[in-house]
Curated annotation (Swiss-Prot):
The encoding gene: dxr
Positions that bind 1-deoxy-D-xylulose 5-phosphate: 128, 154-155, 184, 207, 220, 225-226, 229
Gene Ontology biological process terms, A to Z: isopentenyl diphosphate biosynthetic process, methylerythritol 4-phosphate pathway involved in terpenoid biosynthetic process
Residues that bind Mn(2+): 153, 155, 229
GO molecular function: 1-deoxy-D-xylulose-5-phosphate reductoisomerase activity; manganese ion binding; NADPH binding
EC number: 1.1.1.267
Protein name, entry field: 1-deoxy-D-xylulose 5-phosphate reductoisomerase
EC top class, as a word: oxidoreductase
Keyword NADP tagged: yes
Length: 396
């Protein structure tokens, strides 16, 4: 490819978006920012636009768009401001775009990510919900469009690096026995079970290793994040749920492992910094400097592993059940979790009630086949309705 790659960053003001911009800025001859999108931190989006001079910016509604357009003009920029989901899809699929960082959190990221896939882009997938909600439809679109799908979650990027290039032939065909997803265990890995009832949002968001947004920090604490990653791994690598094992590894130095039938286990190691998988995906199949410090094994000293405790992490069990059920179950799991986590962060429910809401939603609604995107969003809406009804009956 001649000239720099033009990059759209969906979710530019989040932690993944900011890390992407850090890597991009290190290689101005290789990458050029084409579009930036933001949702609520619009002052930060303005500052990023001034720094990176994209051709487009996208915000959620018209009032914010007019203000941002005026502020950009005052700064001497001719960046064009677009609005809403239509704007997101436009900058994701734009003919001038080479690569799209899909980093919008939650179900809101599905349509623009799918737009990038259908346009045949190189898609750097940080929005795991896109695959969780609509895995079969999403992967079918990848195959039909010829899009290049590169995982950004550190675990899936690690697996991608440890698998042979022809893994699409099937894990069995390339000699893979199982995939092992590592997890830090979050802030409550050793908290006495009786104390979990009184966990606060601030405690749940204080991750011991990674710096993340509030929603994903809670998901990490409950290990729902790992459950969603299990479902994502099944779609990315055409694995059965029983081929994906979760291992708690508190140091977060080994990002995941691949176990082969000959007894070999390949692992990818690195300091816990999202710039590593971002740089790997941006440059693939080449390599570029990410700005991450070299790994110092002498300083780390030891690596520990343990099996997840199902009583401590019921969300992981629920996610595995949804993966095994298939159909509408993963979309409903994700939607119920989004509602429950938002309620917990707002102080409306207790920490341990997150899993209870999700389990009730999954138990109340039968699993149905997902034959199109409308069915995905119908399952999502139904789960949100049921979770909302639970909150009306039970919130404190």
């Amino acid at each position: 490819m001649s000239g720099p790659q033009h990059i759209t960053i969906l979710g530019a003001t989040g932690s993944i978006g900011l890390s992407t911009l850090d890597v991009v800025a290190r290689h101005p001859t290789l990458y050029q920012v084409f579009a930036l999108t933001g949702f609520s931190r619009l002052d930060e989006l303005l500052a990023l636009c001034i720094k990176h001079t994209p051709q487009y910016a996208v915000v959620p509604e018209q009032v914010a768009a007019r203000k941002l357009q005026d502020d950009l003009a005052a700064a001497g920029l001719d960046t064009r401001v677009l609005v809403g989901e239509g704007g997101l899809c436009e900058v994701a699929a734009h003919p001038m775009v080479d690569a799209v960082m899909a980093a919008i959190v939650g179900a809101a990221g599905l349509r623009p990510t799918l737009a990038a896939v259908e346009a045949g882009k190189k898609v750097l997938l940080a929005n795991k919900e896109a695959l969780v909600m609509s895995g079969a439809l999403f992967m079918q679109a990848v195959r039909q469009s010829g899009a290049v799908l590169l995982p950004i979650d550190s675990e899936h990027n690690a697996i991608f690096q440890c698998l042979p290039g022809d893994f699409a032939r099937g894990l069995g065909a390339v000699g893979v026995r199982r995939i092992m997803l590592t997890a830090s265990g979050g802030p409550f890995r050793e908290t006495p079970l009786e104390q979990l009832q009184d966990v606060t949002p601030e405690q749940a968001c204080a991750h011991p290793v990674w710096s993340m947004g509030r929603k994903i920090s809670v998901d990490s604490a409950t290990m729902m994040n790992k459950g969603l990653e299990l479902i994502e791994a099944c779609w990315l690598f055409d694995a059965r749920p029983d081929q994906v094992e979760v291992v708690i590894h508190p140091q977060s130095v080994i990002h995941s492992l691949v176990d082969y039938v000959d007894g070999s286990v390949l692992a990818q190691l690195g300091n816990p910094d999202m710039r590593t998988p971002i740089a790997n995906a941006l440059a693939w199949p080449a390599r570029v400097d990410s700005g991450v410090a070299p790994l110092d094994l002498f300083r780390i000293g030891q690596l520990d592993f343990q099996e997840p405790d199902e009583e401590r992490f019921p969300c992981l069990r629920l996610a595995r059940q949804a993966a095994e059920a298939g159909g509408s179950a993963p979309a409903m799991l994700n939607a119920a979790n989004e509602v429950a986590v938002a309620a917990f962060l707002d102080g409306r429910i207790r920490y341990l009630e997150i899993a209870g809401i999700i389990e009730e939603v999954l138990n109340r609604e039968p699993v149905t086949a997902v034959v199109g995107l409308d069915a995905v969003f119908a399952a999502d809406a139904k789960a949100r309705l049921l979770a909302g009804q639970w909150l009306e009956r039970n919130e404190r």
